């Protein structure tokens, strides 16, 4: 159980206007507009996020997809999480349908697509590669390594990384991966060795940018000292605030690292389309293992959804759109990656870029949320064992 009430010594934060998934399951958990600016390459070191206004927020609103930077990688302000198309939120989608959704996202201005070797496993990378091949040079692909899919467990040994990247490149039908994340920090391999292996792959042109998923602030600093980290991917949403409390967001801001929230609509819960009667098949849906998705927690957390619904009515929007707009309003270097296999849900998600939350809106949302309690852990105990705690 997580309480959201502020520390008595800390005043409520005012959000200024942003004028935006055993072992395989553990591995898989990571994570409307038209033209966007061209993608930027380069891996130069940077210190501090400088693409910001004095209060670290940027203008938001309108129907045109804007561009944000993850380190030196320029991407659309909303990305596309491709895991759920192939695995982990029910049976895999029809391949034709999955490709159509990915391509529709690109047509609507999305240039950032997220996958991983473990999703499926392998089938997500294959689907993404096929879907994006016709316009590969107009998009950025993020994928992930870090699990031993034959022996089981974590494996970030440099020689393993340099082997699996070749397989991912083939499945993705490309000669380079724009952003390559360590999926989970391997306690048996120094992060400096991991960063060094990625540095070698960057020199070879096979990887363009380095990322970490579910890493602690300490690990981020150690990795960044060897090879610039472009992005951190961690669960973060209106109801899941760990990155605000554990120093990860602050470290990203200090070091000029972008942040990519996975599960930005609470694995579907914040859409308001599931209630205490929702059930999840343990054979195909990771949420069946999570206490936050038990009938008891689903009912207990409903006030959070009601809060978003009330706000959505005022803004002529949906709860999902408010949740995404809230994330986009936090920092100009945050890029949420909502995922869906449903075309209507895709359009709904992308509609979030037209929702403008004022300073008063953000303060009201924060004040109301601070009176609520989030029930149930974000993942099961066995999944949390693979999350880096920085010790």
Language model features by range: what are they?
Residues 71-89, 142-152:
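N-terminal small/glycine-rich loop or linker at the start of catalytic domains
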Residues 75-79, 112, 138-142, 176-179, ...:
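Structural preference for beta-strand elements that scaffold enzyme active sites
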Residues 189-372, 386-391:
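Beta/alpha (TIM)-barrel catalytic core signal, keyed to glycine-rich beta->alpha loops juxtaposed to Asp/Glu
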Residues 92-104, 157-170:
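Short, acidic/polar
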């Amino acid at each position: 159980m997580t309480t959201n009430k502020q520390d008595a010594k800390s005043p409520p934060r005012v959000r200024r206007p942003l004028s935006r998934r055993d072992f395989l399951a553990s591995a898989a958990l990571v994570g409307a507009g038209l033209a966007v600016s061209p993608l930027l390459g380069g891996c130069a070191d940077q210190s501090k996020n400088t693409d910001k206004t004095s209060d670290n927020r940027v203008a938001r609103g309108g129907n045109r997809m804007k561009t944000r930077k993850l380190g030196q990688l320029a991407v659309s302000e909303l990305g596309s999480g491709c895991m759920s198309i192939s695995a982990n939120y029910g049976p895999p989608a029809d391949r034709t349908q999955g490709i159509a959704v990915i391509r529709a996202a690109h047509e609507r201005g999305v240039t950032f697509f997220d996958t991983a070797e473990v999703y499926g496993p392998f089938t997500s990378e294959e689907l993404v590669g096929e879907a994006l091949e016709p316009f590969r040079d107009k998009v950025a692909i993020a994928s992930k390594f870090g699990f031993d899919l034959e022996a089981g467990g974590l494996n970030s040994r440099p020689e393993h990384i340099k082997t699996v990247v070749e397989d991912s490149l083939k499945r993705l039908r490309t000669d380079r991966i724009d952003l390559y994340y360590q999926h989970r920090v391997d306690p048996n391999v120094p992060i400096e060795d991991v960063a060094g292996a990625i540095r070698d792959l960057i020199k070879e042109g096979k990887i363009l940018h380095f990322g970490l998923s579910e890493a602690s602030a300490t690990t981020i600093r150690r990795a960044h000292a060897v090879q610039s980290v472009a992005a951190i991917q961690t669960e973060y949403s209106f109801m899941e605030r760990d990155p605000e409390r554990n120093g990860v967001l602050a470290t990203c801001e200090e070091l000029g690292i972008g942040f990519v929230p996975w599960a930005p609509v609470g694995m579907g819960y914040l859409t308001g389309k599931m209630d205490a009667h929702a059930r999840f098949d343990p054979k195909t849906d990771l949420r069946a293992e999570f206490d936050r998705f038990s009938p008891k927690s689903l009912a207990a957390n409903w006030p959070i959804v009601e809060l978003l619904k009330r706000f959505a009515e005022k803004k002529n929007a949906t709860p999902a759109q408010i949740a995404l707009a809230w994330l986009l309003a936090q920092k100009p270097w945050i890029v949420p990656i909502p995922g869906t296999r449903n075309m209507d849900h895709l359009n709904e998600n992308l509609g979030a870029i037209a929702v403008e939350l004022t300073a008063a809106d953000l303060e009201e949302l924060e004040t109301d949320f601070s009176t609520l309690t989030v029930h149930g852990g974000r993942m099961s105990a066995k999944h949390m064992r693979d999350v880096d705690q920085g010790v």
